[in-house]
Amino acid sequence: MARKKGTSTRKKQKKLSFDYGVVHIKSTFNNTIITLTDKDGNTLTWASGGTVGFEGTRKGTPYAAQLAADKVAREALRMGIKRVDVLVKGPGPGREPAIRTLQGAGLEINQIKDVTPIPFNGCRPKKRRRV
């Protein structure tokens, strides 16, 4: 069946309205992924070093994390979110610049929590690197 003339194929975007969100920052040495969720954990928007235009080793830089955080913060403010909790995971260099950018963009940060997984004597670690 052919599509009628004058109709669009784009979906209608739902008008989302929240006042509170959770920002998850996963910072590795290769990339930083920033996800904005509602309080139930449903993803609203996300950005990473790759989605803001960096490739390869530059995705892991603090500047890439800063731009990704700015993109998420602008989207959050557009949705009406003003207050956020920040959950940080991982040891990468993008942790602090991302938090500073979220705060500088106008989001009110309630709490910052480090949720980096630490094993309680779990799996045997990889052998030590010899250079």
Curated annotation (Swiss-Prot):
It comes from the Bacteria. One of its GO terms (biological process) is translation. Coiled coil: none annotated. Located on the platform of the 30S subunit, it bridges several disparate RNA helices of the 16S rRNA. Forms part of the Shine-Dalgarno cleft in the 70S ribosome. This is Small ribosomal subunit protein uS11. Keywords: Ribonucleoprotein, Ribosomal protein, RNA-binding, rRNA-binding. The keyword Ribonucleoprotein applies. SUPFAM superfamilies: Translational machinery components. The lineage of its organism: Bacteria, Thermotogati, Thermotogota, Thermotogae, Thermotogales. GO terms for molecular function: rRNA binding; structural constituent of ribosome. One of its GO terms (cellular component) is ribosome.
